[in-house]
């Protein structure tokens, strides 16, 4: 019996430790990107509303996203902020709640996305020790990438690296990407040989049809392209 006592005590301690975990809850208009250096699997269509957090200090990369009316059509599109990093000290099995600083309803999503401000509260109304740093890491739009030739920025990957860094949280800036003009100034006015265009790569084809389109058609194309993101 004596040999069983230490084992029983150990099992009780292990059970207590596993039960001692907090939760960070976010509304639908926010999205988890990374936690302590690891990506968080979440998306607009598979929203993750809470993260379980063990005692200690955690770095969580989050961004704001909301569906708004499109400027060019009657359809809707998503507005996304650059990621911001929350450093949160967890000292108990509390329920933490994140929301926009202005309240549950963001009146001007596009303006808010430029500089998202948040507040964190605790379910028991206790004090919350946290810091927030906004980054300047942004995803280049689909249309911009079509005509610049740039590769898409891995926002989640970079955010994961930022949350895994030791020391103070710093703003994350995307690495500069060299770009080159692929459409010359003369091509805006000179006639285009359609037979050559048919042999061009997809990017050149899109550039060709973009130059031929009127303003209304361009706006319709941009609205469609945004809806594909």
Swiss-Prot record:
Record protein name field: UPF0319 protein Shew185_1615
Keyword Signal belongs to the record: yes
Family note: Belongs to the UPF0319 family.
Organism placement in taxonomy: Bacteria, Pseudomonadati, Pseudomonadota, Gammaproteobacteria, Alteromonadales
Pfam families: DUF2057 (PF09829)
UniProt keyword terms in alphabetical order: Signal
Superkingdom field: Bacteria
Residues making up the signal peptide according to the UniProt record: 1-21
InterPro entries found in the cross-reference section: UPF0319
């Amino acid at each position: 019996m004596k040999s069983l006592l230490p084992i029983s005590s150990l099992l009780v301690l292990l059970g207590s430790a596993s039960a001692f975990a907090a939760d960070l809850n976010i509304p639908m208009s926010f999205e988890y990107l990374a936690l302590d250096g690891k990506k968080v699997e979440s998306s607009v269509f598979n929203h993750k509303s809470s993260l379980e957090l063990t005692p200690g200090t955690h770095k969580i990369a989050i961004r704001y996203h909301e569906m708004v009316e499109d400027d060019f059509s009657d359809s809707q599109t998503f507005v996304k902020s650059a990621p911001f990093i929350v450093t949160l000290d967890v000292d108990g099995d509390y329920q933490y709640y994140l929301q926009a600083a202005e309240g549950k309803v963001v009146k001007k999503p596009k303006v808010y996305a430029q500089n998202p401000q948040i507040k964190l509260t605790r379910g028991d109304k206790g004090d919350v020790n946290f810091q927030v740093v906004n980054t300047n890491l942004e995803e280049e739009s689909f249309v911009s990438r079509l005509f610049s030739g740039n590769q898409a920025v891995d926002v989640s990957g970079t955010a994961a690296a930022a949350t895994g860094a030791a020391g103070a949280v710093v703003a994350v800036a995307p690495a500069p990407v060299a770009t080159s003009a692929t459409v010359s100034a003369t091509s805006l006015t000179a006639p285009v040989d359609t037979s050559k265009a048919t042999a061009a790569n997809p990017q050149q084809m899109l550039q060709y049809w973009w130059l031929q389109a009127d303003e209304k058609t361009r706006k319709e194309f941009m609205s469609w392209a945004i809806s594909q993101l």
